[in-house]
Amino acid sequence: MSPFSIVLIGFAMSTDAFAAAIGKGAAMRKPQWRDALRAGLIFGCIEAITPVIGWLLGRAASSYVSAYDHWIAFVLLGALGTHMIVAGLRNGPEEAEDAASDTPKRHGVLGLATTGFATSIDAMAVGVSLAFLDVHIGVVAVVVGLCTFSMVTAGVMLGRALGNLIGKRAEMLGGLILVIVGSVILYEHLSGAA
């Protein structure tokens, strides 16, 4: 897998966390940099670990499905991407109410970690699909973690001003990127096999 594809996956995986960070930032009256950095660190660490867990699970099953690995990666990335696009198109009234609230909130480590884990489930599934490709999972984990750290830190700081508008678009963009990466993986395999 090319370095460019790995970076694309890193940013695609961080868009859910970015959308959540915008909501977190919107819930705070005036988020400080330390709040944003703390959220970025928590989300980034969780988002870096989950694809490794998925990769380990995928590696355990890889000998059984190696003839179909490119299709598995395509279907998983395509399904996750489509899900993210559909979720981005939906109008989430609960998220809108949370973002519109003027009540300042502090977000504790447990609350941030719970949200971070919830937004990283897709990264675990991507990790499963990466087990079937020629990729160094350590590099992917670091890239995903750094992308998530950056996106969440920026998301918290942008949250108050921008609200859910950017968050939904970021999720749709991330989904589109996953669909494209999955399609490229399938195309590269099929064109190389032909």
From Swiss-Prot:
Keyword rRNA processing belongs to the record: no
Bilayer topology annotation: Multi-pass membrane protein
Principal location listed in the UniProt entry: membrane
Pfam family, one: Mntp
Keyword list, A-Z: Cell inner membrane, Cell membrane, Ion transport, Manganese, Membrane, Transmembrane, Transmembrane helix, Transport
Subcellular location: Cell inner membrane
InterPro entries assigned: Mntp/YtaF (IPR003810), Put_MntP (IPR022929)
Record's GO cellular component terms: plasma membrane
One Gene Ontology term of the molecular function aspect: manganese ion transmembrane transporter activity
TM stretches of this protein: 3-23, 37-57, 69-89, 110-132, 147-167, 172-192
Domain of life where this protein originates: Bacteria
Function: Probably functions as a manganese efflux pump.
Family that this chain belongs to: Belongs to the MntP (TC 9.B.29) family.
Name under which the protein is recorded: Putative manganese efflux pump MntP
Source organism of this protein record: Xanthomonas euvesicatoria pv. vesicatoria (strain 85-10) (Xanthomonas campestris pv. vesicatoria)
Gene: mntP
